[in-house]
């Protein structure tokens, strides 16, 4: 209950973004010539010891934004010639992201990428259906022992093993 305090994701009741900008160094297939319109959300439900965005994932860095402001950020990134809107580690903000996407969609003409750690619940994925064009999960662990030791998440693979087929069901196999 985030009304009573921060959750496992290190976040409270507001959307917090660490950075929103063109990002030319994402996976080459989504960066293109101008870069991916990347929104790095603060916080994360995983506790990976090797996280490359540790400051973003463990601390409430960045700025709080409203749903309307988030939708405006998506459109501004599109105006800057982003090849897509790349939502990085947004699972814990999904209800608000969905609202922002619904606000922006009439004017948004570039694909939406859900860039996640693969640890997505069916409820989250069902909320995103029809709004996300590309799922970009990182499949991190196979064994409960490894996931528990390195992410404090022993059920990681059992959750991801259900999430990834659902992602494929929604958007189909990748086309390069």
Residue ranges, per PLM feature:
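Conserved Radical SAM active-site core
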Residues: 5-135, 143-144
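Alpha-helix N-cap and loop-to-helix initiation/capping positions
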Residues: 65, 92, 151-159
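A general structural signal for well-ordered alpha-helical packing
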Residues: 125, 129, 157-164
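Histidine/lysine/aspartate-rich catalytic loop segments that bind and position anionic ligands
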Residues: 140-145, 162-165
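Conserved C-terminal portion of the radical SAM core fold
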Residues: 159-176
């Amino acid at each position: 209950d985030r009304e009573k305090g921060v959750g496992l994701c290190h976040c409270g009741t507001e959307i917090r973004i660490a950075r929103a900008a063109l990002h030319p160094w994402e996976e080459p297939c989504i960066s293109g010539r101008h870069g991916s319109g990347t929104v790095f959300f603060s916080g994360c439900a995983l506790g990976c010891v090797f996280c490359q965005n540790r400051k973003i994932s463990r601390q409430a860095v960045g700025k709080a934004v409203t749903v309307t402001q988030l939708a405006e950020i998506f459109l501004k990134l599109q105006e800057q010639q982003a090849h897509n809107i790349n939502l990085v580690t947004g699972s814990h903000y999904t209800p608000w992201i969905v609202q922002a996407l619904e606000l922006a969609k009439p004017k948004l003409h570039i694909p939406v990428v859900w860039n996640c750690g693969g640890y997505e619940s069916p409820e989250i994925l069902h909320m995103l259906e029809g709004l996300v064009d590309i799922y970009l999960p990182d499949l991190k662990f196979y064994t409960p022992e490894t996931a528990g030791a390195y992410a404090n998440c022993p059920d990681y693979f059992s959750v991801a093993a259900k999430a990834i087929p659902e992602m494929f069901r929604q958007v189909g196999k990748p086309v390069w």
